[in-house]
Each structure stands twice: as C-alpha cells, then as structure tokens.
C-alpha cells in the first residue's frame, strides 16, 4: 500500500481519474508482505490402553511457504479428573459442570482453566528436521512426524492430559496458531479371569471359588502334617504312612502298642510278660520235666570245684525255686500310692505293680526281644558289666583214663607204677591231670612233687630248658616239642577206634603217630627218670617263668584237635541266668529286681 500511495502522490499534475484508477489497480493486485496462519487438530479426543502406541495429529496452513515455522507440543494436565467424574456422575461438581456447559456450548471444564493450577510441560520441539524432547520426556520413544504430528510408541501412566500443538512463524501476524487434543491412558483388563499366564478360566461363581480355595488349603495342610509326622515322629502322634518318605520313616507301631497295652491291660505282642496281666489263655506252659543225669564223663559232682581256677570253688548262693504265691507275698515292698484315675500316673503305677510281683524263677516265653528288655529293666542295681574284667567260662571236665585205678589224693602211686601197666600214648597221656592253677605253677618249681613226674624233658630244638606256659585248660599240658608227647593223627577213624575199645578214654589224651625211634628208646628205658628234668629246671632263672609263650601257643594250636567252641557274646541275659540256677539259691551273677 505504501508504494501505491507514493505513486499516487507522485503524480499530482495528472488527470484525477487516471490517478484513481492506478491506485485501485495497485491496491488490488500488489501482494501483501504479512500473512495469517491456521492450526487444526483432526481428532481432539483419544483413549488408549497402557503401553500401546498412539499418534496425536496436528496440521497448520501458511500463505508464506518460504519461512519454516517452529512446532511446539506442550502437555497440560486436566483441570478436573475425568476418571473420577466418570465413576461418580451424580456428584455436585458434575451437576455444576453440566449447568455451565448448557449455558455456554463451547465451554470445557476439563481444559479451560488457568495454567497456574495445573501442570505444564514441554513435550517436544521441531524446527526443520530436528526434534528435541523436553527434560521430563528424555529417553522416551516420542517424536514429531509429518508436519506436526506427535507420536507415542509406548504410552505410560501419567500421559493422560491435554496436549497443545503450537506453530510459531516470524511472519505470523494474525490467525489461530494453537490447538489441543485430549489423551486418556487406561489399564488393560481381560475379558475372562486369568489364573495363570496364558490360562483363562470362564466365569466362576463366588461361592464355588470359596469352596475350591478351602479344599485346596485343607489338602495342603493335611499333606504337610502327614509328612511332618512321618519325618519327625517324636513331635506328633499320627500313625499314617506318608508317600513322600516311605523308606526313611515309618510309624512307631511298637511304641503305640506298648503304651496302649500299658494303659488298657490288653496283652501286647511286644511286651506280653512285663506290662500286661497274664490271662489264663496266655499263661505260659509249665517247664518240661528235667531228667536226672549223671556227672559228665563219669566224674564226681565236686570235680568242677576242684578243677576251677585257683583250686577254690565259688561259694555263692544260687537261685531258689520258690512258689509264685510266696514270692508275691514277700515282694510286696514299697509301692507308689498313685491315683489310678489320673491318666498320667497309670503307666507308672502299673509298671511298679508288675515289677513288685515279678518272679524271676517263673520261665517266660522264648522271645529274644522280651528277654533283652527284661535284662535292661532288672539290671539297674548291678554294677556295670563293662567295668568288670571278662572271665572265660570253665571248660567241661574231661575224664582221666586212669581215674578208676588211681585216687586224686595219691599221686605217688602213678610214679611207682610200672610203665607197662600205664595206658599207651607216652608220657603226655599217662600222667594225672592238674587239679588247679597252683599245681600248674608247681611244675616249674624245682624240687616239687609234680616237677619230677609231670614235666617233659627239655627239647633239643631249643637251647634252654623248656618251661611250659601257664595253662588255661587241662588239655594244654603237653609239650609240643617232645615227639613222645604229640597226639596221634587227626584221622577221624582213629577216634572211632579208640571209643570202640574204651568208651571212657579221652581222644585228646591219646598220642598221635609214633616215631620208630621212640619204640626202641622205650624198650631200652622202661621207666621215666625225673632227675634229669629236675637238674634242668634248677638252672632256669626266675625271669624265664614270666616270658610270654605266644609263639609256642600258636604252634600248639595247629597240633592238637580243635578246642571246644568259645563262649558267644551274643548269648542273652536270660541264658546266663538259667545257667546260674543251681543248689536252690540266688547267685550273685543273677539279676536283682
């Protein structure tokens, strides 16, 4: 307009009609250097699901395309919470907003408010092809695409609000350069209840859901309880087998049966004679009749006492066979005066009563477990067997071959008897047996009555006088180095021949195979001379007697017949008690209640 006005003013002398025409032409056809801008948003309302992408479109129009504008997206929070108002439509605020919207059709109470009462942030800015995110949205996948479209690749909580699109240009003199779009981000809800990831269940009634939960909880506690009782049976009292540990754990049935029998008096298979009354049907049968038997191998009754260790008999009282009624009267004793109605004292009262009426002379059932249990209960007053030295039992006495012809009180007659009348077998089988350990020690002492006739001559293999070890058995009094003292061959038919000729003869006292040179020696020397042995024993020092003859004993073990079977440590306590019952008295080895 200024150039046209100047042109019109520059021709004052021209025709007035021409000037007016030129001015109108310039005003109409000359371009205006300043133009207006227009910004629009095609979809002002968006609702999306959380973590879903969304794009807010924005377009603008400018008459001057030579200048590149600056696009700015701003975030402003809602003036009012749309979600809260949606759940409470009958509130007072909603009614007031409805009245304002009715009076002013263009009024929006969720958008139109001052910026001072809500949050305002810059989301992104675009100038040319460069996009810059605001400080709050750094790291988010947000960009401006197209002319001015704002794109969210993944929405998040807090993105709900009003987004304003503003276009700024240096030649923008008039027009609307700003528009807004609302965005609401909601959480995702499945159409059907999802119990597990990828597993959906249909609609379920509330009461049915409660029943299912209760049953599942009951089964869980039952399984845990059973497994706990089986793995730790001492902490609870359940007796149901559990499949989780069938090999490691089992129910304490024996303890349960014993406790039930002790409280109710019913006979139990675990302890029938201790904790329960003996019913007539369960009374054990009487012991079998004892057949009187003579002394073994023809020895008198006092031979075992003479041949015991030390030559002395153990004068201890043995068990007396008394009547059970008398024993029950004598064993009344002290008794706990407990209240039988009290369940906690019934077991103790019943056990005290049974122990008071218990008679050791009454034979019990042949049950190894019961016998071992009885020994544990009745041996409380004895000394600890571990502190006592172990003592081997006395061996069975063996009959001497010359017992009928010689008395034990006259050993000299054996020496004076001619050798032709002595039994065959040499010096070892023809001598009398020792009656005690003291007699064995006298063999080694020179000048004793036993040394001249019971000691074999020294062996030529050893360079010293032979001193036999301290014998633990009457069968070990042979000299393994003397060829005349060796037993016969171990041929089993030889023993049968000996028994057929003389039933009383002891096969262990017979001589083994004889050397032909010994026969000639006996023909030249018909009688044994003990003076040579006495002279050899006088030269032996006292220290030689205490030497350990372990090697000689090992050699002797392979030359003699097998010894009797040793005492078994697995014998029960009741077996030892029955062996100690003798002469109608209670032995000190027996168990005392």
Swiss-Prot record:
Q: How is it modified after translation?
A: Phosphorylation at Ser-308 by MAPK8/JNK1 and MAPK9/JNK2 may be required for exclusive localization at tricellular tight junstions.
Comp. bias (Basic and acidic residues): 375-387, 435-444, 472-550
Q: Which residues lie on this side of the membrane: Extracellular?
A: 36-206
Tissue-level expression = Specifically expressed in liver. Also detected in kidney and lung.
User: What does it do?
Assistant: Probable role in the clearance of triglyceride-rich lipoprotein from blood. Binds chylomicrons, LDL and VLDL in presence of free fatty acids and allows their subsequent uptake in the cells. Maintains epithelial barrier function by recruiting MARVELD2/tricellulin to tricellular tight junctions.
| Protein's organism | Rattus norvegicus
Where in the cell does this protein reside?
Answer: Cell membrane; Cell junction, Tight junction
Compositional bias (Low complexity) spans? 445-460
Keyword Disulfide bond listed: yes
Superkingdom classification of source = Eukaryota
Cellular component GO terms held in the UniProt record = bicellular tight junction; chylomicron; low-density lipoprotein particle; plasma membrane; tight junction; tricellular tight junction; very-low-density lipoprotein particle
Q: Mind telling me what this protein is named?
A: Lipolysis-stimulated lipoprotein receptor
SS bonds (residue pairs): 113-165
Which keywords describe this protein according to UniProt? Answer: Cell junction, Cell membrane, Chylomicron, Disulfide bond, Immunoglobulin domain, Isopeptide bond, LDL, Membrane, Phosphoprotein, Receptor, Signal, Tight junction, Transmembrane, Transmembrane helix, Ubl conjugation, VLDL
Family membership noted in the UniProt record: Belongs to the immunoglobulin superfamily. LISCH7 family.
Primary localization: membrane
Q: What's an example of a GO molecular-function annotation for this chain?
A: triglyceride binding
GO BP terms: namely: epithelial structure maintenance; establishment of blood-brain barrier; establishment of skin barrier; liver development; protein localization to tricellular tight junction; regulation of lipid metabolic process; tricellular tight junction assembly
Q: Which residues form the Ig-like V-type domain?
A: 89-181
Topology in the lipid bilayer is annotated as: Single-pass type I membrane protein
The membrane-spanning stretches of this chain are 207-227
């Amino acid at each position: 307009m200024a150039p046209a006005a100047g042109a019109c003013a520059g021709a004052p002398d021209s025709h007035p009609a021409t000037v007016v025409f030129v001015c109108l032409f310039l005003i109409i056809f000359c371009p205006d250097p300043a133009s207006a801008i227009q910004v629009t948003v095609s979809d002002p309302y968006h609702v999306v699901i959380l973590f879903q992408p969304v794009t807010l479109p924005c377009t603008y129009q400018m008459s001057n395309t030579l200048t590149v504008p600056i696009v700015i997206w701003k975030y402003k929070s809602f003036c009012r919470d749309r979600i809260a108002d949606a759940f409470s439509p009958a509130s007072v605020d909603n009614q007031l907003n409805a009245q304002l919207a009715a009076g002013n059709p263009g009024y929006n109470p969720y958008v139109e408010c001052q910026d001072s009462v809500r949050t305002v942030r810059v989301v992104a800015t675009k100038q040319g092809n460069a996009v810059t995110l605001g400080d709050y949205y750094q790291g988010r996948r947000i960009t401006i695409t197209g002319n001015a479209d704002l794109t969210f690749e993944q929405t998040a909580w807090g993105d709900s609000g009003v987004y304003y699109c503003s276009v700024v240009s240096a030649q923008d003199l008039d027009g609307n350069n700003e528009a807004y779009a609302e965005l609401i981000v909601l959480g995702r809800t499945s159409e059907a209840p999802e119990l597990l990831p990828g597993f959906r269940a249909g609609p379920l009634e509330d009461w049915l859901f409660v029943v299912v939960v209760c049953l599942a909880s009951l089964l869980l506690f039952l399984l845990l309880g059973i497994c706990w009782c089986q793995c730790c049976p001492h902490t609870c009292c359940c007796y149901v087998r559990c499949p989780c540990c069938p090999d490691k754990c089992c129910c304490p049935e024996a303890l349960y049966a014993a406790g039930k029998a002790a409280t109710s008096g019913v006979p139990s298979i675990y302890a029938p004679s201790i904790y329960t009354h003996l019913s007539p049907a369960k009374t054990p049968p009487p012991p079998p009749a004892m057949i009187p038997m003579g002394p073994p191998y023809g020895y008198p009754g006092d031979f075992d006492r003479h041949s015991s260790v030390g030559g002395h008999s153990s004068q201890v009282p043995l068990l007396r066979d008394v009547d059970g009624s008398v024993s029950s009267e004598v064993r009344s004793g002290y008794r706990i005066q407990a209240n039988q109605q009290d369940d906690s004292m019934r077991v103790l009262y019943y056990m005290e009563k049974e122990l008071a009426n218990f008679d050791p002379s009454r034979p019990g059932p042949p049950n190894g477990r019961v016998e071992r249990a009885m020994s544990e209960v009745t041996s409380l007053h004895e000394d600890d067997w571990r502190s006592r030295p172990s003592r081997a039992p006395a061996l069975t006495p063996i009959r001497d071959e010359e017992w009928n012809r010689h008395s034990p009180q006259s050993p000299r007659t054996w020496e004076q008897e001619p050798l032709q009348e002595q039994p065959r077998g040499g010096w070892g089988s023809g001598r009398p047996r020792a009656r005690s350990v003291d007699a064995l020690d006298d063999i080694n002492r020179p000048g004793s009555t036993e040394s001249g006739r019971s000691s074999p001559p020294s062996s030529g293999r050893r360079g010293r006088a032979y001193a036999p070890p301290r014998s633990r058995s009457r069968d070990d009094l042979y000299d393994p180095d003397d060829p005349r003292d060796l037993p016969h061959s171990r041929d089993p038919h030889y023993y049968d021949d000996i028994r057929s000729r003389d039933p009383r003869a002891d096969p262990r006292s017979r001589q083994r195979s004889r050397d032909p040179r010994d026969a000639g020696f006996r023909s030249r020397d018909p009688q044994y001379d003990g003076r040579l042995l006495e002279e050899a024993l006088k030269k032996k020092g006292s220290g030689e007697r205490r030497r350990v003859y372990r090697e000689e004993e090992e050699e002797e073990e392979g030359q003699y017949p097998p010894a009797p079977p040793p005492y078994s440590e697995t014998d029960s306590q009741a077996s030892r008690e029955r062996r100690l019952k003798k002469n109608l008295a209670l032995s000190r080895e027996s168990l005392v209640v």
